[in-house]
Structures are given as C-alpha cells and as structure tokens.
C-alpha cells in the first residue's frame, strides 16, 4: 500500500437482511422452514397467483418491534407497506412488498468494541419486507425454489458511520449478537438467515464529502466482509489516483459488486439502479399498520439483558479481562454457561479462561461449541475448584479436560475415579528427594535466584514439574524449593 493510500478513508454503511423465525411467512400461512423439499412450502400469495391477497403476520410485527426496542429505535405508531417493482425469475409477482417511505422503526444504535474502544454505530431505519425465492442452477438450465419466497425479513439499514473494515465487522458481530439474544432469528449465516450488503465509498481524510458508493452484495462471512472492504477500498483509491482530473462520479460510478474469495477481488455485477426504476407505490392490498404505545411497552418488557450491558457487568462484577468478557457475551449460550458455572465457582477469571480458551479450543474439532457438547457448567466449575484447592495441577487439569471433551459425559471427579494415575503426587518424601536433586544439579540457577533474579525460580520449578510429569502440587513444590535453597 502506497503512502497516498493512507491519506484516504473508507465510509461504510451496512444493509442487513434478517430472516425472522416465525412459523409462517410474512403474508401467507405457508410454512417458514429452511431445508425442505423445493416448492413444498408455498401458497397462492407467495407464488403470485391472481386474486391471492396478503395477510400480515402479527408475530413478524412483534419481532420487528422487539428489535426496535433492543436498539433503542423509534417504533412507529403508523407504518405502511409499498410495492417495489422489478422483474426476476425468483419474484413471481414481479414486485416485493416492503416499507419504502414509512418503516416500522426509525433510528436506533448498536454499541460495539473496536480494538479496545467502545463505539456507537447509528441506524437509519429498520423495515419489514418479504424475501424472494431462490434460483438453483443445474448445468445448462435453472430451477426456481419458492420455499423462501415470502419469508419475513427485517432489513436493518445503518447510517454511513463506519470508517474501516474493523468497524464494519465489529458492528456486524454486535448486531448478530443482539439478534440472537432477543431470539427473533436463528442467525445461521451459512443458510442465509443473516445476509450483509456492504456499501463503501472512499474520500480524502478530513473531507466530509460522500462520493458514489459501491454495494457488495450478500456477504455471509465476517472474514470475507473484511477482505472485500479492504480490496474495494484500495480499488477505488487507485481509480481516483489514476484519474485525478476527472469527475469523481464518473471515475467510480455507483454500482453493485460481489466478492470473489478465490481471486480476492470485487467483481462488477451491474451499475446501480435508481429508486425511480423500482416504481414504488403504496401496497393497495394491505392497510396501514397501527401499533399502540401500550403494545410497544408490553414488547419492551420482554427484552432480556443485552450483550453490551452484560459485557459491562462481566467486567465490573466478575473483574474479567475485556477480551474474554467479549468472547463470552458474543454468544448467549456461552454467556449462560459461564453464569451457571459461577454459581459453583468463584474464581471467575479462571472460569472465563477455561471456557473461552481451553475448552473452546478442544471443542473446535468436534464441530460443537461448549454449551452443546453435553459438558455441564458445574463440571467446568469443579475442574477449576480442584486446581484452586490443590487436588490437581494445571497440567493434570488439561488432561482431564481432554477426556471430558472426548467422552462428553463425565465430570472431573468421575474421570479421576476411573484414572487414578492422574491424581497428583502425594509422596512428600519422594518429592523432597526430587527437589534436593534439582537444587544440587542447578547451582548456578540457585545462585541467580539468591542474587535477585526471579526468573531463576520459575526455571527450577519447571525442572521439578518436568521430573514429576506435572503431578507435583505447585504450592508444595514452592515451599520445598525455597526451603532447600535456603539450606544450599
């Protein structure tokens, strides 16, 4: 990256499509379920049959209102649906029912931690709309699956308030956490339950100008999102630097791109349509949506504790490291697992480390996260308590953790009962002999410690633990070692 590139900044906004986990579709009684046989979850409404009239799903409305409350948005007492007209094979009606001028939620914000700094990202609006079907290609022909047609969506539109790929990914992560906590979507990005359209433009640093934006469609991976934003940022900067005297609007026209993960580049799909190209007009078959203040308050009362407030509580009440607190709260199941474990163990920092680092790493190979392995929170608490009480060493604890993950059905106590060889060394006479031997064989390190070099103590402890295969109680090792060095 040349020096000139550092004199530019990105301006980024996200449009996020979230499939709501209602039992039926937004405007019809057809089943809303992913993975069924093609064209089995359909109705005359979602296939655009003449005379079929839409009926609004009240559960979808409730979920949209709940989201509005979660992000502290202004839930509209009156909102309206519009037709967005376009022709494409996966849209049998040749229009989408959306909310163009009067969305159900305006404003709101999402708080996220970006590289240790708390940032607040503002939302423009959130609106209800129905999804399109899905084209499936088979060699020289294509089929259309209308199971997804009519699935309820909320589209969450942020303001252009992000200025780096790191900002965008942090915002997206925080948003998905909120959606998961309030339970309005399964948030399965691989199945398309959450899809990100990323808008990016660039400008010289210090400028307030908003240049033409490029939209990168259907990102379903945070890694790809970061890569795409970086690649598109540098592509646009290069275009402007290569054409310094031309009209910026012509240098980088408004367009839609896609991300090619193999070539690591954005690929042009089409130039941007204008709003008038969609011929928006009021949906004639649906009345104005009216919501009362009392209904909004009733929905607001059902909000759980949200990720950001939980994150702040973990730092203050449990004295957790910020990075581990963030990992814990990013998934509501993991957060619940941790809080259940704290009922049996008060070493909160050790608990957070075992859950987010030790067990998370071991569970990765199973394809499951810790809360879904069958390992109970009480067992992890028991493991930490055993270490703290000197029942086992840290090394033995890791061996027990390996067995807990491989068996999924045994507590540390069960494992120690079946594998007594894992119990720590209890022969104090034998341990004294090992300590005496290590001190005698490492006279230089003993002298270093006596001269104030604290690292020498760690080296000597390491030698003792090595000879005892990690089974010597660390506290007893320190006691015997310090006594032996005083006598040396």
Swiss-Prot record:
Q: Which superkingdom is the protein from?
A: Bacteria
> Which reaction is the catalytic activity of this chain?
L-glutamyl-tRNA(Gln) + L-glutamine + ATP + H2O = L-glutaminyl-tRNA(Gln) + L-glutamate + ADP + phosphate + H(+); L-aspartyl-tRNA(Asn) + L-glutamine + ATP + H2O = L-asparaginyl-tRNA(Asn) + L-glutamate + ADP + phosphate + 2 H(+)
Which PROSITE patterns does the entry mention? GATB
Do you know which InterPro entries this protein is assigned to?
Answer: Asn/Gln-tRNA_amidoTrfase_suB/E, Asn/Gln-tRNA_Trfase_suB/E_cat, Asn/Gln_amidotransferase, Asn/Gln_tRNA_amidoTrase-B-like, GatB, GatB_C_1, GatB_Yqey_C_2, Gln-tRNA_amidoTrfase_suB_CS
Pfam families given for it?
GatB_N, GatB_Yqey
Q: What is its EC number?
A: 6.3.5.-
A GO term for molecular function: ATP binding
Keyword field contains ATP-binding: yes
Which keywords does UniProt give here? ATP-binding, Ligase, Nucleotide-binding, Protein biosynthesis
Quaternary structure, per UniProt, is: Heterotrimer of A, B and C subunits.
Q: What does this protein do?
A: Allows the formation of correctly charged Asn-tRNA(Asn) or Gln-tRNA(Gln) through the transamidation of misacylated Asp-tRNA(Asn) or Glu-tRNA(Gln) in organisms which lack either or both of asparaginyl-tRNA or glutaminyl-tRNA synthetases. The reaction takes place in the presence of glutamine and ATP through an activated phospho-Asp-tRNA(Asn) or phospho-Glu-tRNA(Gln).
User: What is this protein called in UniProt?
Assistant: Aspartyl/glutamyl-tRNA(Asn/Gln) amidotransferase subunit B
Gene that this sequence comes from: gatB
